[in-house]
Amino acid sequence: ELYSLPFNMYTFNKMWGVVTPEEAKAKIEEQRKEITKEPENLEEQAISLVGRDIYEKLIKGYTEKQWGRDCRELPAFIIKRLPVRLTFDNNYFNALYQGIPVGGYTKMVENLLDGIEVRLNTEYLENKEALDALAEKVIYTGPIDAYFGYELGTLEYRSVRFETELLDQENYQGNAAVNYTDRQTPWTRIIEHKWFEFGKDSEGNDIPKTVISREYSSEWKLGDEPYYPVNDEKNGALYARYKKMAEKEEK
């Protein structure tokens, strides 16, 4: 089955057969009533926002793959709100003007960095003193616990692994990204890269082959690439302690 995301009238029509915003809203409101108290976990929070059907079909499996935990073990505050559109607008973003840089983001960043010194394969924390001496203000974008040598303990992160494959076919899935929201499929989504630039080469010709990447979410351990932090109360409290240490930094 294929559903349109974010949740919109195409989604609700496929799931329930409803054809008007009033019908869709009534269906969601009916199912939201299942939760009668303050949500205590992510499952209850999601159902209180969009109902049982959408939760089971499009949220539960994907979320559990993403976090590696049962939704009932995840805190409710992870989901503040779930966008629901009672229109047939299935665009992911709401911005009036949307686009992708011609040639991709790598080319755009290369242009931005033209004339700026860039050092590759250089570990900041291993060369901190020398690198700090180069500027009056330093912007560090790595893990905050690593910055302080894990002095207070290690924050929990999730990592992501990609399997990329070149296929001898012109069109694999007809879309740049397809999420797999069931729990059984091991990957969270498949990216078909050519559709980010509309499947054409630099001269505007169709490309006869395609490249796909399967994305897998996994537990993180030291040495892995941390993609996003585990957002729960324990890690939030530890982060707050590290943040206080960071506020005392002079540079």
Language-model segment annotations:
Residues E1, L125-M245:
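Mid-domain catalytic core of redox enzymes
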Residues L2-P6, Y10-K137, T141-F148:
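Active-site/ligand-binding neighborhood in enzyme catalytic cores
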Residues E247-K251:
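Short FAD-binding loop at a beta-strand-to-alpha-helix junction that anchors the flavin cofactor
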